[in-house]
């Protein structure tokens, strides 16, 4: 009787095939720990700069609380990369680490999707989605670069291996071809996300960003071996579904009640919306996002919505926006051309829009309840953020000092806001106090007789597609250097003028032209008061061009003062 031949079973996969599964779970656990730590940081952390601590320590504390990308991404990736190189040889088992790069990029997507939820109910009390915009930008870039490196390294590995056919590996195998498609899409996204490209055509970037993200989430499970369907695909699809639901459930139709744009030399406009579109209460400085398309229109999902800071308070009868429209004017042209750009987004009375939702500002709760020594500094259309804050603190009896400084290029911008105050019956005279005041600084010259007849000579194009807020490139021309901030004793040949041109608020609002502006001089009383009160009672708000934000932030760091800013950017 013949013995049956010995049958040898060969493993389909090498011993390293499943080496990265546990690492993927580890990344997911680190993401969860980071979220818990972030919630605790915002709930119990201290953003207040201690007067007894060094400037360096205060800076680190502030950057940590403020979700600075460099600090937070450094902490996150330090934890994630600790076990990245472990057990397997980098020279003889390099495939393990190349695959690990791919799994790392996909395992980080749930965290990225979670932090961009609008609203984010887990972090809603102590965070807003705008807090995560800088973090999201850099986190997304790192994720895409890691995924792209995974693909590039495998292509190089196959290309230099004489025993491997690159065509067979890359094209003829479905799972690898799916990965190749992902790499091409990710590369295109990275090109579109470069600053100049993104600013030149934000709509293109936004469309590519969303489509590539969806493709990355859905194609990676086809490409990945071992699979990533559970839990990663399930988590990613669930979070995507929540994003979609948020844009459906909270959205509502709206029409413009009124639009005031009848001014001779500014593209600053006042838009009035129905009060019913928002809940009974919203915090001062909140903002809304508006889409020109209905929810059933595919463009509602493909194109970006437009954010606008609410200039009203919750008790007002309407929702008011003070915004700047996109400029296409050449020097010396008429103001009507400011609103003729077909690429821009304008709110018109005859159209129906979709309000996606309203969102709270990035202002700590203790500021509203404890603040008694307040300074607000804004530039251009940043007045939409500053004005409701000023009104909120002006109406509080316990506020000891309140000053708002508004830097603008032209008197016509002030006229529009003044008209807005008159139209809404807003007068500050009934609670007049020497410690409550508005100062308006105008960088250009004007006289009361000729200011309305002058034609603007320096209007830059703006991009209305900014990720947050109604401040835009138009205001970037409002440089602090135009106000001689670097030299308080500058001997300018242009005479300074200072007067209060209104009857209703004549003693309250002071308008200054060609006035030497220095933050320290304007805030002497504010700084003196800060030494007399509890540290949690002193707050400085800033909203405007980068130079203004940097100046305000430096002032607060030097003086150990709480700082809140509204930042806009693509």
From Swiss-Prot:
Q: Where are the transmembrane segments?
A: 21-41, 70-90, 142-162, 177-197, 374-394
Q: Which residues lie on this side of the membrane: Extracellular?
A: 1-20, 91-141, 198-373
Q: Which domain of life is it from?
A: Eukaryota
Q: What is its EC number?
A: 1.16.1.-
Bilayer topology annotation: Multi-pass membrane protein
Which residues belong to any copy of the FAD-binding FR-type domain? 250-388
KO phenotype (gene knockout): Increases frequency of mitochondrial genome loss.
Q: Which residues lie on this side of the membrane: Cytoplasmic?
A: 42-69, 163-176, 395-570
The record places domain Ferric oxidoreductase at: 101-219
Tell me which UniProt keywords the record has, alphabetically: Electron transport, FAD, Flavoprotein, Ion transport, Membrane, NADP, Oxidoreductase, Transmembrane, Transmembrane helix, Transport
Instruction: Enumerate the Pfam families for this protein.
Output: FAD_binding_8, Ferric_reduct, NAD_binding_6
Catalytic class of the enzyme: oxidoreductase
Q: Name one GO cellular component term.
A: endoplasmic reticulum
GO-annotated molecular function: ferric-chelate reductase activity; superoxide-generating NAD(P)H oxidase activity
- The primary location reported for this protein is membrane
Compartments where found: Membrane
Q: Where does this protein have compositionally biased stretches of type Polar residues?
A: 480-505
GO biological process, alphabetically ordered: apoptotic process; reductive iron assimilation; regulation of actin cytoskeleton organization
Complexes and interactors: Interacts with ribosomes.
UniProt function note: Probable cell surface metalloreductase. May be involved in iron or copper homeostasis.
| Entries under PANTHER family matching the protein | METALLOREDUCTASE AIM14-RELATED, NADPH OXIDASE
Q: Which family does it belong to?
A: Belongs to the ferric reductase (FRE) family. AIM14 subfamily.
- Name it: Probable metalloreductase AIM14
Q: Which organism is it from?
A: Saccharomyces cerevisiae (strain ATCC 204508 / S288c) (Baker's yeast)
Per the record, the gene is AIM14
